[in-house]
Design a protein with these regions (language model features):
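Conserved "HGTGT" condensation-loop signature of ketosynthase/thiolase-family condensing enzymes
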Residues: 1-74, 95-97
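Conserved catalytic cysteine-centered active-site region
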Residues: 36, 40-52, 79-119
Length: 119
């Protein structure tokens, strides 16, 4: 049994925190962080929930793919930083999208995406 990815979507929280901003309250600097990680800034949730971001990304993926949420066969969410343990993030996303398919979460840290695809 195989699957096809017809579209992808992404969403980021509105607030971005620079390394310089971090250095105002942490003993660090932009140079120290950037030379070790390559990171200049990161997005942080202030008002958005994981569900909000997952739904926004899913809606974009559905738009790109040209299909309706009612046509989905399965929703798998991979995260280690969910808003809640129960119900699964994927179930909350399915409900907000109006999808009637099975939905569940995979928790495998950085490798989660790969394991979610392998399910």
């Amino acid at each position: 049994m195989g699957f096809t990815i017809l579209g992808t979507g992404s969403a980021l929280p509105e607030r971005s925190v620079s390394n310089d901003e971090l250095s105002e309250f942490l003993d660090t600097s932009d140079e120290w962080i950037f030379t070790r990680t390559g990171i200049k800034s990161r997005h942080v949730c202030t008002t958005e929930s994981l569900d909000d971001l997952a739904v926004a990304a899913s809606e974009r993926a559905l738009q790109v793919s040209g299909i309706d949420a009612s046509q989905l066969d399965l929703i798998v969410c991979s995260t280690t930083t969910g808003d809640h343990l129960v119900p699964a993030e994927a179930c909350a996303v399915a409900e907000r999208l109006g999808a009637a398919c099975p939905a569940f979460d995979v928790s495998a840290a950085c490798a989660g995406f790969v394991f979610a695809l392998d399910v």
